[in-house]
């Protein structure tokens, strides 16, 4: 499943600590999961989790940047996300004189919040199962060269056709994204609204936000203060707009409140967000290729690159700051590749 897609991931705890773990598409919760969720302790109406025609939790869970999840936690567009998700923005604002990576950053008032060019926050307005429509289009359309068939370019055209046929309102800030799931057996259309005036509000120093660094990455339990804060700005009418000093904090439709009561044993819990993708349906040959080709190359090429980067970063603070985000991005799936191969060998998957 791709990063751009909104899922619910459940760890459904009961008094006997049974976990029903998995990833589900939000529109399918009512038909596929509601009964089990209620048996395991869900109390709110399922429509409060996902409602295509009204407010629900999906209106407070956002796609942050290129592949992360954020949660809107105030009525004025304050977004909580991971430190590693905000890391590129923190690096973008850092220099030798103001090393926010090392020292952290806190805006003490709205005027001190830092505009972050290139950073976007995306709300999911609707998720539509368009499988039948796409299959009809696939039967009609011909691609003699075979190069664009089911490509993002082709699927975008199909999305535009569907939106026009169904009279879906499109604004300059609307983004349509059509994705194939389950090996092309299901197709979902995501109708999104994108905000591009995003400002950094706060981040702890890396000694907290990146505690453990690569040693602890992909390891659990963790002891990292892995959080950062940003705010969504819009024009005076609440519409998405490029940065302007006249923009104001977005008055959101819904935000999450944070309970100070904590979580008790047996509480029902679930996580909504953009968790990346999985390859649960790989055949053994694909797993072998992942281990021996993709992961092997990723481990050794990235390892060599990171060695060169680190040597230079240790010599010069300006170089360290400049390459901090690139190094962290490279190291993330370098560590993942190593751990994945070790796990597959240990569990004798092949």
Feature locations, PLM:
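Terminal presequence/propeptide segments associated with secretion/organelle targeting
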Residues: 16-350
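Bacterial N-terminal signal peptides
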Residues: 7-14
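Positively charged n-region of N-terminal signal peptides that target proteins for export
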Residues: 1-4
